[in-house]
Amino acid sequence: LVGSEMCIRDSFKGRQWPPGSMEEGDSRFLESVLAEVLAHLEPPKDGRIRHDVPPASLRKTTDLDLPLVGAGLDRVLSDIRTYLSQAVRTDQPGFMNPLWGGLTPEGLAGELVTAATNTSMYTYEIAPLASLIETAVLDRMRQHLRMPTGAGTLTTGGSNGNLMGVLCARQAAIPASGHDGFDGRSWCMFVSNEAHYSVAMAANVLGLGLANLIKVDTDGHGRMDPSALDHAIRREANMGRRPLCVVATSGTTVRGAFDSIDGIADVCETHGVWLHVDAAWGGSCLFSTTHRHLMDGVERADSVCWDAHKMMGLPLVCSAFIVKRAEVLRAACAHVNEAHYLFHDDAEERDLGRLSLQCGRRNDALKLFLSLIHI
């Protein structure tokens, strides 16, 4: 540790260590950066969203060699200009390739403040107001989901939210699995054949195995067929495999289909199976009086993931995972009990790190909080 600190100190020769208060010229530099960013956010004069430059050509026109001696802030500002000139204009209305895009001023402001305050969300001690803001945001999202009780956390995205949904399903079905492990070969999980690939990732990571991921037929509109789901669960049960969970999708990646949550929930209740809803894209329909019906029945789900950075146009990443039974999420994250140096009994109810798979975690709630204040 001492040797590492000496190396770091040496790299900061001529500057304050640890880096902290602004030095002379730093404020002017940041003002210049902000001016460049604001200029970049003006509509492109040629209307283009991206410049189709092959990697080899871009390498030739961009200095990517990292210097062995610091080149100073003027070089940094020059490189920022270069970066902005080649950036895909994800803030523009014409950017429609993925399921996210756009930019709101309050969202950008939240990102700037989050970066400037640079805290982590594991304990109230180090992120007091940020912890309360995240709790307030999650409470509002639960209200829209019509889940009066429960808990949640901000995650790294919908893929992480789906992973946590399956993890909580495993915890509910096999309470000792987090401590003892489990044999995934006797269990299976059900998804539509148009579900996001992150559900397969969850099956892989959690030890269920891709062979035990059962894909259920969809109708002509790309929605999971509840009767086909019921048949699949019964078929697998006859083969000696137990259902771990069902993942419904609210807004599929390719066709934007919304599964019938009510129909799927009926099947899950019949078989006593955990229902997770992947509402990464479609969750924001809950803010719409016109389109809310697409998610009818979501209050019957056991867990939900919801990406505010998609339909709401917030900067990446702003994604929530919400579970109806808080005790299941706490038990699924029991690994935090090993961190006695970080988490203490007297702060158990206010330390958000106890409900997360992450330790270091940025304050992604602020931009959503500011957005909800604005709209």
Model-flagged regions — what are they?
Residues 1-8:
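Short, small-residue-biased leader/transition segments that mark boundaries at the very start
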Residues 252, 271, 296-372:
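Active-site C-terminal subdomain of aminotransferase-like
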Residues 257-289:
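Catalytic PLP-binding core of fold-type I/II PLP enzymes
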Residues 134, 138, 150-180, 199-203:
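Conserved beta-loop-alpha segment that forms the PLP phosphate-binding cup at the N-terminus of a helix
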Residues 9-149:
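N-terminal entrance/gating region of PLP-dependent enzymes' catalytic architecture
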Residues 6, 156-159, 179, 183-248, ...:
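PLP-dependent aminotransferase-class I/II
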